Curated annotation (Swiss-Prot):
This is Hydroxymethylglutaryl-CoA synthase. The keyword Transferase applies. CoA binds at R204, K244. It comes from Thermococcus sibiricus (strain DSM 12597 / MM 739). It is an enzyme of class 2 (transferase).
Length: 350
């Protein structure tokens, strides 16, 4: 049985863009408040008072359009992956589409699958363009992720996102998809019920049954279908809830950490949830050379992974200079203490 996901037409990325808010809080500051030592990362990004998943998505989408150099009205689908959408009943995708000038002749919808909502949207965009139904489709993954005060998730849950415009493969394409592979199981590792402010997690399911099983299975499935080995890839980006987990995956798969570190940003911006691998890939595209092959594997609790093989093309050299690079946002910092952080994140709930 053929398990590789590959559209009829070859498709690729014609534009990409990321956005990370400028505010930061150090893990040391969070630990000071809660009396905790030993931290999973160094610091994380924090959204401003007027920023949410929608505004992050808009900024990322605008950067993607700068690199694509296309009329936004040519985009026939805009799909937004997030688990922190501002409205329970009202699509966020329509707000983004209106803000970038893509309305009204397009399909728009919000996607949900915990931290892999962004790549879920990307899979749909690849299929939509690859079937011939549209010239361009945009997939966005962005979050202002939540963590209960004092919970270990609070040390990593952060804000950021990235957008990708998918189009038919041409010489103007920045990179193209060789194929993808998706893997899902019903694993109760993380959830948030309706009307609850913060997610809960089943600790014993978090590591091996959820994250490691899904990501490794998806990565191995993709490589098996494409008849590749880990050595065939120049870069690898895995979902990054922290620094330890993706480096452990790389070690298990036999991928040197030097191929992972360029896209591993969680140590300095935290876990951007639906944006995590999308932001990581954007950082890799900012430095990759034509001909480089990239392994891209997301993860979403509940649980599942999407794996992609991406080959960089010549057009990357010019187009990546047309918008701010990911590290430009990462290196732009203003630190908050815990009181201001709690205000920015709306943690004062009466």
């Amino acid at each position: 049985m053929r398990r590789l996901l590959k559209p009829i037409k070859d498709v690729g990325i014609v534009g990409y863009g990321a956005y990370v808010p400028m505010f930061r809080i150090k893990n040391e500051e969070i630990g000071r408040v809660w009396g905790v030592n030993g931290f999973p990362i160094q610091e994380k990004s924090v959204n401003n008072l007027d920023e949410d998943a929608i505004t992050i998505g808009i900024e990322a989408a605008r950067n993607a359009l700068k690199r694509a150099r296309i009329n936004p009205r040519e985009i026939r689908a805009l799909w937004f992956g997030t688990e922190s959408k501002p409205y329970a009943v009202k699509p966020s995708a329509t707000v983004i589409a209106e803000a970038i000038g893509a309305t009204p002749d397009l399909d728009a919808a919000d996607f949900e699958f915990a931290c892999k909502a962004g790549t879920e949207a990307l899979q749909a965009a690849i299929g939509f363009v690859g079937s011939g139904m549209a010239k361009y489709a945009m997939a966005i993954g962005a979050d202002t992720s939540q963590g209960r005060p004092g919970d270990h998730l609070e040390f990593t849950a952060s804000a950021g996102g990235a957008a990708y415009i998918v189009g038919e493969k041409t010489s103007d394409t920045l990179a193209y998809f060789e194929g993808s592979y998706s893997y899902v199981t019903d694993t109760p590792d993380f959830w948030r019920r309706q009307h609850e402010h913060y997610p809960r997690h089943g600790n014993r399911f978090t590591g091996e049954p959820a994250y490691f099983h899904q990501i490794i299975s998806a990565a191995k499935g993709l490589m098996e279908e494409l008849d590749y080995s880990p050595s065939d890839f120049d870069f690898a980006v895995f979902h990054q809830p922290n620094v330890k987990f993706p480096l452990t995956v790389a070690k298990i798969l036999g991928i040197p950490k030097e191929k992972v570190l360029p896209g591993l940003l969680s140590g300095i911006i935290g876990n951007t949830y639906s944006g995590a691998t999308l932001v990581g890939i954007s950082a890799v595209l900012d430095i990759a050379k034509p001909g480089d092959r990239i392994l891209w594997v997301s993860f979403g609790s509940g649980a599942g992974s999407d794996a992609f093989s991406l080959i960089v093309q010549d057009a990357i050299e010019e187009k990546r200079e047309l918008a701010p690079k990911t590290m430009d946002y990462v290196n732009r910092k203003k630190y908050l203490d815990y009181a201001l952080y709690a205000k920015h994140r709306g943690k004062y709930i009466l």
